[in-house]
């Protein structure tokens, strides 16, 4: 049968495989493409095609990530798979590959391992909304009681990190059996069950355009006779001419009205997520606005100076620091379009942070930034990126 062209009419969702090294993340990714290819929803990608992941740069950090796409009857998916543990850490913290949900792969033969725990913690910290579990390699386990034990362990681990461990779907199967065309009861049918669970359990993300308006300010001009224009790329939502907005961050929040929107020198009646626009703001002086602030729907985002973050610190080879740092370290935190100096407090029991570590830390900025949970930032010293992080929770 002729392969049907990917239809872009279905809702889109970004997912990825996470879990301990060698538990079968890449094999499962290959098995999903193989299974869905039979119904025209994917092009089969073999293990070695996925494993040879290209390097990409995100926020000054090099990350290897493989991207595959496929679709089920319900949704179109972009799926990320990383070759190494460090790539997962970097990917999740930088948000280079946004995940609306993830498939946690656990080997039934080994049970949860250190990186299983670490990936669940990272998923919690960076705000991955939902997980589905694939208990892989069940063909290597003869004892059904052992399988039940592993499932129980996984559920307890998920609950320990505030995921609903009792409710998360756990599918038991084998990626390898699927790839080798073995017993479909362990292989192909279980992969179909997994995708049904992903369809049903991972919520459809809200489209950026449906969220409250926010635009990071990149530049400010004054146009004689017209007033002040701020430019930037709309991150989310829609702004219409005549809308009241707030200018948030770095100084006291100001209310104003958008009196004009232009794009490529043409006047528009609105700007929406993804557009690079200039917004004319009423009664605002050129010196009252600066790069690093945001335009936002009133009340939708507030300025803060203190937060808890999850961060990855670059190795020397990645262009990062050569030496460790300690509590009271004062780098710059680059949010959206600007740097703000902040002080780092390490958690109790953590004496120092070595290049290559990922850590939880408390940060206090010297000036407030418009932020919400999940906001990404770079850690810089004199314009050079030495780390990346994500706001896990706001404390003040």
From Swiss-Prot:
Chief location category: cytoplasm
G3: annotated span: 81-84
EC number: 3.6.5.3
Region (G2): 60-64
Region listing for G5, in residue ranges: 174-176
Ranges for region G1: 19-26
Localization per Swiss-Prot or TrEMBL: Cytoplasm
Keywords: Cytoplasm, Elongation factor, GTP-binding, Hydrolase, Magnesium, Metal-binding, Nucleotide-binding, Protein biosynthesis
GO cellular component: cytosol
Gene3D superfamilies noted in UniProt: P-loop containing nucleotide triphosphate hydrolases, Translation factors
An annotated Gene Ontology molecular function: GTP binding
Chain positions covered by the region annotation G4: 136-139
Database matches in InterPro entries: EF-Tu_GTP-bd (IPR041709), EF-Tu_GTPase (IPR050055), EFTu-like_2 (IPR004161), EFTU_2 (IPR033720), G_TR_CS (IPR031157), P-loop_NTPase (IPR027417), Small_GTP-bd (IPR005225), T_Tr_GTP-bd_dom (IPR000795)
Described purpose of this protein according to its UniProt entry: GTP hydrolase that promotes the GTP-dependent binding of aminoacyl-tRNA to the A-site of ribosomes during protein biosynthesis.
Entry similarity comment: Belongs to the TRAFAC class translation factor GTPase superfamily. Classic translation factor GTPase family. EF-Tu/EF-1A subfamily.
Subunit details: Monomer.
NCBIfam families (alphabetical): EF-Tu (TIGR00485), PRK00049.1 (NF000766), PRK12735.1 (NF009372), PRK12736.1 (NF009373), small_GTP (TIGR00231)
Listed name of the protein: Elongation factor Tu
Origin species: Gluconacetobacter diazotrophicus (strain ATCC 49037 / DSM 5601 / CCUG 37298 / CIP 103539 / LMG 7603 / PAl5)
């Amino acid at each position: 049968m002729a392969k049907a062209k990917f239809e872009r009419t279905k809702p889109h969702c970004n997912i990825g495989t996470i879990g301990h090294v060698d538990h079968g993340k890449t094999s499962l990714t290959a098995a999903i493409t193989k299974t869905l290819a039979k119904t025209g929803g994917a092009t089969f990608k073999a293990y070695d095609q996925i494993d040879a992941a290209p390097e990409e740069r995100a926020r000054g950090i090099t990350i290897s990530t493989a991207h595959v796409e496929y679709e089920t009857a319900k949704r179109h998916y972009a799926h990320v798979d990383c070759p190494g543990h460090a790539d997962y850490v970097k990917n999740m913290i930088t948000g280079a590959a946004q995940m609306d949900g993830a498939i946690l792969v656990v080997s039934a033969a080994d049970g949860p391992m250190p990186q299983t725990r670490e990936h669940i913690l990272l998923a919690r910290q960076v705000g991955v909304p939902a997980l589905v579990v694939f208990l892989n390699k069940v063909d290597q386990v003869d004892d059904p009681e052992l399988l039940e034990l592993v499932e129980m362990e996984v559920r307890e681990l998920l609950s320990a990190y505030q995921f609903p461990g009792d409710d998360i779907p756990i599918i038991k199967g084998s990626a390898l059996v699927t790839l080798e065309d073995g017993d479909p009861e362990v292989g192909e049918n279980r992969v179909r069950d997994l995708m049904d669970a992903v369809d049903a359990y991972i919520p459809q993300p809200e489209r950026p355009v449906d969220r409250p308006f926010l635009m990071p300010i990149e530049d400010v001009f004054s146009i004689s006779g017209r007033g002040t224009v701020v430019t930037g790329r709309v991150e989310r939502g829609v702004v219409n001419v005549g809308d009241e907005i707030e200018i948030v961050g770095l100084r006291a929040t100001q209310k104003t009205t958008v009196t004009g929107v232009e794009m490529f020198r043409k006047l528009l009646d609105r700007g929406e997520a993804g557009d690079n626009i200039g917004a004319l703001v009423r009664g605002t002086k050129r010196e009252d606005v600066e790069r690093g602030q945001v335009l936002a729907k009133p009340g939708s985002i507030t300025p803060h100076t203190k937060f808890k973050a999850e961060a990855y610190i670059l190795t020397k080879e990645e262009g990062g620091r050569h030496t460790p740092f300690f509590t009271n370290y004062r780098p710059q935190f680059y949010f959206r379009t600007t740097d703000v100096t902040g002080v780092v407090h390490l958690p109790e029991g953590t004496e120092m942070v070595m290049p290559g570590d990922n850590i939880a830390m408390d940060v206090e900025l010297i000036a407030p930034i418009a932020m919400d949970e999940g906001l990404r930032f770079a850690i810089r010293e004199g314009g050079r990126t030495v780390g990346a992080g994500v706001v896990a929770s706001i404390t003040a």
